[in-house]
Amino acid sequence: PESLRQASRDFFVGEHWDGKFPASVTDAMAQIEPPTPGRILFETSIPKVSPWSAENPVLYTLHFELIDPAGNVIQISNQRIGFRSVVIKGRELLVNGAPVIFYGVNRHDFNRHTGRALTREDMRQDLLELKRWNFNAVRTSHYPNDVAFLDLCDELGFYVVGEANIESHAFYDSICNDPRYLGAFVERVGRMVERDMHHPAVVLWSLGNESGKGLNHEAAAAWARNRPLIMCEYSHAMGNSNGTLAEYWDAIHSLPGLQGGFIWEFWDHGPDQKLADGTVRSAYGGDYGETKHDGNFCCDGMVFPDRTAKPAMHE
């Protein structure tokens, strides 16, 4: 019918495209009747792609154009993607067919000047700092991170453990078994997976942090015994700490199935506080006169709030 418009080869532009569509793509070029919402689904094989990895983060760009019946381009969208495989074989996690070691760190969103409000450049500087210290993996403790952060992990080359915003320290023995919370658990994990599953950097999912020891976790432990062991948190960097890293890594480098972990954590969460004499210090619990606080428990990173590395980082 005249009201239908078929997608044309002329409207599909790709930097590496030779102008020939596979049959599966041609068959999927659906006719969409304006203004009814429509969807085009197709799958195809792309030859000679370079696999994405933290060491070689090759990305490709998908270019989409939405065209009205008159042939006018009304919307353009670009999406960077990477190609990689992640499988568990025996007791090893394989990326592109090879076992990997996670030199990881736990990272919270934090800036000593702006608190939890970060710019894209703040995120980039965090990742560049981690690159300088030879980290290759980040756990998004304890919530899904901004998509901009995942985009940067795709670009710069980091393996990411995406963690759902499920945290129930004080009640985890009850909430994880309470059916009233089932919908919330499933929804939070599902929304994270649906949003982030196309980022090549995301290779693992975490269902939450310290959120239960119920029967569900007994079942999960039984399932995990024949899987790789990757520590989501270890070597807590508070005070005079991180002194046994050599022993950890001797074991990691010598035992199959032990594939690294994520140090707690990247940096101290001490915001700048200006004192009466004009000097500035990194503050923590109690420094603002509050009576209920957790003391210096927010200062358990390998770098100070001003990004100066502690001896723990050198260790």
What are these regions (language model features)?
Residues 201-205, 215, 225-315:
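Substrate-binding clefts and catalytic carboxylate motifs of secreted carbohydrate-active enzymes
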Residues 150-161, 173-186, 273-285:
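Aromatic- and acidic-residue-enriched segments that line the glycan-binding/catalytic groove
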